[in-house]
């Protein structure tokens, strides 16, 4: 199973390493990241524990997390497949980018590459992801990465006492590769 791959020219996915703790801490200092984090990352120890957990899950085969880096190995973001169900060959995709990397196609390129890796290397068939409906940028990432809209989960998430609806997307191993960045994928005809 590959742990380092080219996502697109100048963009790479590689396993997280302990040396990335500072980059993780810096990324989570962004208010947008803090707002959506399941667990706070406010100290070097928090960042180190987060990375150690990713390594444990990789070894166990329950989740595979990659740092998204440029040619100089600068961390631009994160992409992962988790909640892996081997019986049904499914997984859940998550991603984030640093403030400086947003809006440049980093997340969609990383998600496209992760999906192909999950199908080819991890043997999964179906990948799912979701985003709050008030996050149109994440919806564009999903579409550009070939994830078709499937539906709405009402009031699924709660942040600071406020419930949020989540739009769900999925991509199958049999779906065509996304034809063009920025264009939503269409589900195959049934």
Sequence positions of predicted segments:
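Hydrophobic residues in alpha-helical segments
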Residues: 28, 37, 58-59
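Acyl-donor (CoA/ACP) binding surface of acyl/acetyltransferases
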Residues: 1-32, 65, 69-190
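Short loop/turn motifs at secondary-structure junctions and domain boundaries
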Residues: 56-61, 147
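Juxtamembrane/interface motifs at transmembrane-helix termini
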Residues: 42-46, 55-57, 97-98, 186
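Conserved GNAT-fold acetyl-CoA-binding loop/helix
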Residues: 32-53, 66
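Short, P/G- and charge-enriched loop/turn segments at secondary-structure junctions
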Residues: 1, 53-55
């Amino acid at each position: 199973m590959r742990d380092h791959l080219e996502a697109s020219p100048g963009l790479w996915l590689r396993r997280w390493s302990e040396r990335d703790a500072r980059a993780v801490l810096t990324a989570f200092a962004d208010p947008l990241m803090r707002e959506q984090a399941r667990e706070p990352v406010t100290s070097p120890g928090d960042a180190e524990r987060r990375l150690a957990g990713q390594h444990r899950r990789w070894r166990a085969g329950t989740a595979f997390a990659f740092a998204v880096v440029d040619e100089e190995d600068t961390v631009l973001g994160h992409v992962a497949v988790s909640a892996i169900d081997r019986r049904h060959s499914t997984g859940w995709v998550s991603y984030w980018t640093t403030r400086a990397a947003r809006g440049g196609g980093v997340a969609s390129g990383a998600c496209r590459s992760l999906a192909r890796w999950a199908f080819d290397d991890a043997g999964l068939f179906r990948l799912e992801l979701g985003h709050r409906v008030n996050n149109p940028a994440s919806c564009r990432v999903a579409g550009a990465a070939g994830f078709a809209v499937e539906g709405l989960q009402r009031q699924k998430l709660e942040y600071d006492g406020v419930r949020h609806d989540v739009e769900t997307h999925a991509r199958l191993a049999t779906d065509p590769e996304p034809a063009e960045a920025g264009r939503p994928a269409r589900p195959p005809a049934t």
